[in-house]
Amino acid sequence: MQTLESTLNPPATASEFDTTIHRRKTRPVQVGSVTIGGGHPVVVQSMINEDTLDIDGSVAGIRRLHEIGCEIVRVTVPSLVHATALAKIREKLLATYQPVPLVADVHHNGMKIALEVAKHVDKVRINPGLYVFEKPKADRSEYSQAEFDEIGEKIAETLKPLVVSLRDQDKAMRIGVNHGSLAERMLFTYGDTPEGMVQSALEFIRICESLDFRNLVVSLKASRVPVMVAAYRLMVKRMDELGMDYPLHLGVTEAGDGEYGRIKSTAGIATLLADGIGDTIRVSLTEAPEKEIPVCYSILQALGLRKTMVEYVACPSCGRTLFNLEDVLQQVRAATQHLTGLDIAVMGCIVNGPGEMADADYGYVGKQAGYISLYRGREEIKRVPESEGVSELINLIKADGRWVEP
């Protein structure tokens, strides 16, 4: 006889305990020397805030980002003059630094701009809501199907030269939909909704596919996290139904600054990455672009998608703590933060110590007042005076051959 409890709570399956993130399978899209999708690591990118006409300033901004781990750099291109300036930027990068994958950001009525800049960059980002921009009419309340299709044909005609150019150069395009700039006909037809964002992207994808061009990356950004998450999930659903496998660029647009801007970006980006959705990310902050890169890598590290720093496991401290946990964690971090790939646990007492740090490579645990127990994995190696804890931890790492000089 089946009980009520077993009906409401069926036995858990092995898959429910799977802690691995299973990434959505996508096609690889090459952007310069970097590959987006196709099972490659999630790519980190950002955008310089210098005026593109400032050649030296733009080159310096690109270098600053690239040197701290930004793998693709986007540059705004609001006019033809800016498009030709990118040729000089690329030339100077090659002469004074090294090749950096560059993306041109093209918006309002960008047909001629995009065609010119496609010669000088690795990828062109276009906004479907603005690429063929028509000023909204105050008295319009709807679009007939004929009117909708007529504009679609105009978009296809306008987009074709760029698609052919990128296809023939074997370069890439990002179809970058923004919730705040959906085309009027999409708004009237689908509303101010994730569906409207998805349909806007699909329209441009179909145009590209009709011209045998599939080096595409897609984004559906919004400043509200629930809208952004819903749009990407719906896009994946539609692409799966249509047999499309384009990689996705994740981001919360206009996230703001400071702690909240970082939390807001993480809430959207990490939610999707945890579901296996997303191939490249950008954290958009109202701060210097260089501030975005550590946030990107921290998100990827926290999810186990890329390991680029030491993973520190530390308890929040309580009345059982036998040393100043906050100070000691800072000391341990200062001494070991260059040992990329290690997991180091700092635990204030024996209650949380060995159990919570079981997966760590090394542990620093308060088990007795004035003394520190050092662990290798689950094994306690030695007990030392608290004043010698950090130096003895370093000695243990050195003895195992895992120490490198900073």
From Swiss-Prot:
Keyword Iron-sulfur: yes
One GO molecular-function entry: iron ion binding
Cofactor(s) it depends on: [4Fe-4S] cluster
InterPro entries: Dihydropteroate_synth-like_sf, IspG_bac, IspG_bac-typ, NO2/SO3_Rdtase_4Fe4S_sf
Keywords assigned by UniProt, alphabetized: 4Fe-4S, Iron, Iron-sulfur, Isoprene biosynthesis, Metal-binding, Oxidoreductase
Designated name of the protein: 4-hydroxy-3-methylbut-2-en-1-yl diphosphate synthase (ferredoxin)
Catalytic activity: (2E)-4-hydroxy-3-methylbut-2-enyl diphosphate + 2 oxidized [2Fe-2S]-[ferredoxin] + H2O = 2-C-methyl-D-erythritol 2,4-cyclic diphosphate + 2 reduced [2Fe-2S]-[ferredoxin] + H(+)
